[in-house]
């Protein structure tokens, strides 16, 4: 009977802008997420008095977190990944002094987790930044934003140094290439050069946060967070294989800088070939040497790559412009399901970096419907998660050091890509629909009891 290590962290992951609601309460400022009502790929819509969006209330975690944490504890969670809303701490982003009410909220949240023996894993910036920094400074396009972020990071490290020992800098930092407003606060019309300069500023800020964390909380560990976009060649044609190498490097580059402390040679060539000249100072190069302690990543799907331009044209428009894999089934949202790919990715990252790995997002979004007894019989989710966890166990057997697993959306939340509540991920059902109707009542799905057993048996209950 194969089991997971005794110190393996089990839990779930959420993001402030997808669960908290209370979008202007207690001094919170507007974030980029607040002005993207249709999700990370949607247009920017300036807020006006009296308007509303689904994320303004979301699932009201801001007021209901004690109830939700109690349910997480009932499942046996040893870890909960949350994010701090930067705009609760520095509403506009450029203030000299933080907002005490925002700091106090996260004190209460972390205290509640501690009361249930749940370790917090805290993301500093999860798909949001102060809208004030975008409007007044140009987001991450401005070098000044590095300083604003470092002030924010140092503020929360100092405040929560006794309460939080596991940190992440930027969520899915490589998504800036696909969603520049969400990632770096730049308009969709930005040039490749502008986006990479903003990414450079963010990489420097991430490294400065790592350095600050090590100074302020010596016993803490801080990691990066990548969207694990593993690609396969569509065929064994050498052109497809080379194209796949390049596609994988497009996201691995972020990890290379954050884990190795310098820009890799292949990116230098890419910048030369693309006519991109980054402004990189000696101080930047020195800062980048502060590397992360571990690598965290999300994993939802794999895709295929081909050098055949006609096939590539057909793939335009799906989330990462991937060519479908003919050997895999897809979710309702067209995301291809590939449990073995998770084992492969874990091995790829371990071979590349030799640093501990943490799977901090993995899950199945589906249109759950309660049955006559009000229970969601989500066998499809159980099957999806079971098959992925079996592959995590195999990777651990391969010798990969895996710190833990936090499923995405242990409770239904507003999805990032299209800001839908109908795309449900949770073990816990939340009574609210895409129009904002519902009581917000929480109820346990079938998967709630399944995950509880998996955690209690350290994975022994998984079906091979």
What are the residue ranges of the model-derived segments?
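Aromatic-lined carbohydrate-binding/catalytic grooves of carbohydrate-active enzymes
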Residues: 75-102, 122
């Amino acid at each position: 009977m194969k089991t997971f290590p005794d110190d393996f962290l089990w839990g779930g992951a959420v993001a402030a802008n997808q669960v908290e609601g209370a979008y202007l309460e207690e001094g919170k400022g507007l974030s980029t997420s607040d002005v993207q009502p249709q999700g990370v790929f949607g247009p920017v819509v300036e807020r006006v008095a009296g308007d509303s969006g689904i994320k303004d209330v979301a699932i009201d975690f801001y007021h209901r977190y004690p109830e939700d944490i109690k349910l997480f504890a009932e499942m046996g969670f040893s870890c909960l990944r949350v994010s701090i809303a930067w705009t609760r701490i520095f509403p506009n982003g450029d203030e000299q002094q933080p907002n005490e009410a925002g700091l106090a909220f996260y004190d209460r949240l972390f205290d509640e987790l501690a009361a249930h023996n749940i370790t917090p894993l805290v993301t500093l910036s999860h798909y949001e930044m102060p809208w004030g920094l975008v409007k007044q400074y140009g987001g991450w396009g401005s070098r000044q934003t590095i300083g604003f972020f470092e002030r924010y990071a140092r503020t929360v490290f100092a405040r929560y140094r006794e309460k939080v020992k596991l940190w992440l800098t930027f969520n899915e930092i490589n998504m800036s290439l696909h969603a520049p407003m969400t990632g770096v606060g730049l308009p969709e019309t930005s040039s490749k050069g502008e986006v990479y300069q903003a990414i450079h500023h963010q990489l420097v800020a991430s490294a400065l946060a790592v350095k600050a964390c090590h100074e302020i909380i010596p016993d803490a560990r801080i990691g990066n967070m990548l969207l694990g976009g593993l690609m396969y060649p569509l065929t064994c044609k050498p052109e497809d294989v080379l194209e796949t190498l390049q596609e994988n490097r497009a996201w691995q580059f972020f990890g290379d800088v954050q884990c190795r402390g310098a820009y890799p040679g292949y990116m230098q060539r890419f910048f030369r070939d693309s006519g991109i000249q980054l402004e990189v100072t000696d101080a930047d190069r020195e800062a980048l040497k502060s590397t992360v302690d571990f690598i965290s990543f999300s994993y939802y799907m794999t895709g295929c790559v081909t050098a055949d331009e006609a096939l590539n044209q057909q793939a335009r428009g799906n989330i990462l412009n991937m060519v479908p894999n003919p050997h895999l089934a897809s979710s309702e949202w067209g995301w291809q399901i590939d449990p073995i790919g998770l084992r492969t990715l874990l091995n790829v990252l371990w071979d590349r970096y030799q640093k501990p790995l943490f799977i901090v997002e993995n899950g199945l979004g589906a249109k759950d419907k309660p049955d006559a007894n009000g229970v969601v019989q989500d066998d499809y989710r159980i099957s999806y998660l079971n098959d992925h966890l079996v592959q995590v166990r195999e990777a651990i057997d391969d010798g990969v050091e895996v710190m833990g697993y936090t499923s995405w959306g242990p409770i239904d939340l507003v999805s990032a890509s299209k800001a839908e509540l109908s795309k449900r991920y949770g073990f816990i059902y939340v009574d609210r629909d895409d129009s904002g109707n519902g009581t917000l009542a929480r109820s346990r799905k079938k998967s709630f009891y399944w995950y509880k057993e998996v955690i209690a048996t350290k994975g022994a209950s998984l079906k091979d």
